[in-house]
Amino acid sequence: MDIMHAAVLGILQGLTEILPISSSAHLILVPWLLGWPESGLTFDVGLHVGTLIALCVYFRRDIAYLISDAITGLREGFGSQTSRLPFFIIAGTVPAAIAGKTLEKPIEEFFRGSHTLIALLLIAFGLLLALADTTGPKRWRMDRVDLRGALLIGLAQCLALIPGVSRSGITITAALFLGFTRDTAARFSFLLSLPIVAGAGILKMGELARHGIPAGELAPLLAGMATSAVSGYLGVALLLRLVQRYSLYPFVWYRLLAGGAVLAYLFAR
């Protein structure tokens, strides 16, 4: 993989991992449509690390507060909601961590060539996001997050292993159906993703440490990491601004158009 391809895929990963439009679908469909080779383990590590950097930088204050609240809870008890929130996030991470460890590779192998199914899932879960955005009561803020809600959103996150679903999309959808505001749903979705993205990056770095970085792949690795970090940061800012001021419908329409375009291409071949 050359540096240009790496930079393009890094931008694609950074934006689509953050926005509710499915990064896994785009990282399968775009190289397939353009005739590019599949990315290897080295490049996957760079993309995950870049996304993690973007999330950690953007939510650095939230992370600091969560760590402080967790320490306070351990020292003084969990009488306040803020002291319980870090552990709700950890609890919500457990279902996806288990599912990812056991099902990621079989699902990845099954969907690798299932372009029609991926396009249909882009459309179907886009419509589900539209339904949640339209009908969800949108009353509750972060102080109403409890263990039940965190676990339900965490269970929904398991579906993100399927290309076309979108991790941020399905967790925001679940949070909206539970009654949270758009802003709270998006912010909790990102906080819930931090342990998952970090864990995936650590596992892939462990594999990379065992195999080593192949000759000629360091430059694409760094290019993909840098572009995914920058585009991921911009993606977070864009999504939070849109949900605060408008709605999630721009992403719904994008999913419908992208899925429809892929289906049209497949049927026209």
From Swiss-Prot:
Task: Give the way it sits in the membrane.
Answer: Multi-pass membrane protein
The biological processes this protein is annotated with in GO are: cell wall organization; peptidoglycan biosynthetic process; peptidoglycan metabolic process; regulation of cell shape; response to antibiotic
Where in or outside the cell it occurs: the entry states: Cell inner membrane
Q: Which GO terms describe its cellular component?
A: plasma membrane
* InterPro entries, sorted: UppP
Instruction: Kindly state which keywords UniProt assigns to this record, in alphabetical order.
Output: Antibiotic resistance, Cell inner membrane, Cell membrane, Cell shape, Cell wall biogenesis/degradation, Hydrolase, Membrane, Peptidoglycan synthesis, Transmembrane, Transmembrane helix
This enzyme's EC code(s): 3.6.1.27
Reactions catalysed: di-trans,octa-cis-undecaprenyl diphosphate + H2O = di-trans,octa-cis-undecaprenyl phosphate + phosphate + H(+)
Q: Which GO terms describe its molecular function?
A: undecaprenyl-diphosphatase activity
Query: What are the transmembrane regions?
Result: 1-21, 40-59, 87-107, 117-137, 147-166, 188-208, 220-240, 248-268
Main localisation, per the record?
Answer: membrane
| Domain of life (superkingdom) | Bacteria
Question: Which Pfam family, any one of them, does this sequence belong to?
Answer: BacA
Q: What else is known?
A: Bacitracin is thought to be involved in the inhibition of peptidoglycan synthesis by sequestering undecaprenyl diphosphate, thereby reducing the pool of lipid carrier available.
The protein's job, in short, is:
Catalyzes the dephosphorylation of undecaprenyl diphosphate (UPP). Confers resistance to bacitracin.
Q: Mind telling me which PANTHER family this protein's record contains?
A: UNDECAPRENYL-DIPHOSPHATASE (PTHR30622:SF4)
What family is this? Belongs to the UppP family.
Q: Provide the protein name.
A: Undecaprenyl-diphosphatase
Name the species this protein comes from: Geobacter sulfurreducens (strain ATCC 51573 / DSM 12127 / PCA)
